[in-house]
Amino acid sequence: MQTLTQHLTSQAVNDSLSHLILTLADTSKAISHAVRHGALAGVLGATEQENVQGETQKKLDIITNDMLKDALKADGTVRGLASEEEDHVVEVSKNGQYLVCFDPLDGSSNIDINSLVGTIFSVLPAPAGELTETSFLQSGRAQLAAGYVLYGPSTMLALTTGQGVQLFTLHPETNEFLLTNAAMSISPETQEFAINMSNQRFWEAPMQTYIADLLLGKIGPREKSFNMRWIAAMVGDVHRVLSRGGIFTYPTDNKDPKKPYKLRLMYEANPMAFLVEQAGGKASTGYETILDIQPTQIHQRVAVILGSSNEVDACLSYHGIDYSEEPNPQNSDNNCDTLIEV
């Protein structure tokens, strides 16, 4: 089996990007170690702090965020970083070539019940000039690499550099990521969907109708039965989609009119959409292809519908969208050019 280093060489990934990917992979090994130790290391439970989204931070949210920050500061290729756990973008090195956006511990609410969590990351080119939040506001099409690390029964890294999606598994004895799937592919058809059904009453009418038709199974207009899956961690639900097909959605809702969307564009939706498209699937907000969105702020949220291409198309048809056309962009609040130097 190829190691991650050997694979990057075989794909002719340039040295600086390979170095950054290996830094992210090595840090994920340390995060995996911290997650496995859990209560033994006293790292479970919540803090009294909130992140910029107003979410209570888990102890491991802060620990894993600091681990990634420290590693990226030492890497030498990184110009700046943006994290779910940082209020503002962070300047790392004036000579860096790359910007890194990440969610250090996706699904951290699962950590206290020993369920799936993971790290999601996106790598963008660093533009010339002064680093501001605007430097990061590039569409998902600009991503040079993206991936996630899933901390489950095995620790797995799913990675794309724009040459398909490869899956690596961390060998428990050698501590090396080994290539275990050279070409992940999402089947166009599926009979599985993932959604938080507790929010059903808050969804827009098209999504309510779509899910209702799935639940009708063979006696409904879809004429086939569907199973529902929900891990409550995007990284776990998307891994299942990449592994065996399906559709994952966190749609628009009016539960909190000030926050109609749940998932963050820059370090959740964009990297996952890049992976899904590279594996033959589709990713949309319901009104626009995710990778085509022009971001307006670093913590911008969007609706997400992604997975098996034919099922995403079916979902979009309920929204009255011709998926061959480009709908109007989904906008958010104005950005603010703020950074922190480290």
From Swiss-Prot:
It catalyses: beta-D-fructose 1,6-bisphosphate + H2O = beta-D-fructose 6-phosphate + phosphate. Keywords: Carbohydrate metabolism, Cytoplasm, Hydrolase, Magnesium, Metal-binding. CDD domains: FBPase (cd00354). Its EC number is 3.1.3.11. Pathway: Carbohydrate biosynthesis; gluconeogenesis. It is an enzyme of class 3 (hydrolase). The keyword Hydrolase applies. Mg(2+) 1 binds at E84, D103, L105. It is found in: Cytoplasm. Substrate binds at D106, G107, S108, S109, N196, K262. Its cofactor is Mg(2+). NCBIfam families: PRK09293.1-3 (NF006779), PRK09293.1-4 (NF006780). PANTHER family: FRUCTOSE-1,6-BISPHOSPHATASE-RELATED (PTHR11556), SEDOHEPTULOSE-1,7-BISPHOSPHATASE, CHLOROPLASTIC (PTHR11556:SF35). This is Fructose-1,6-bisphosphatase class 1.
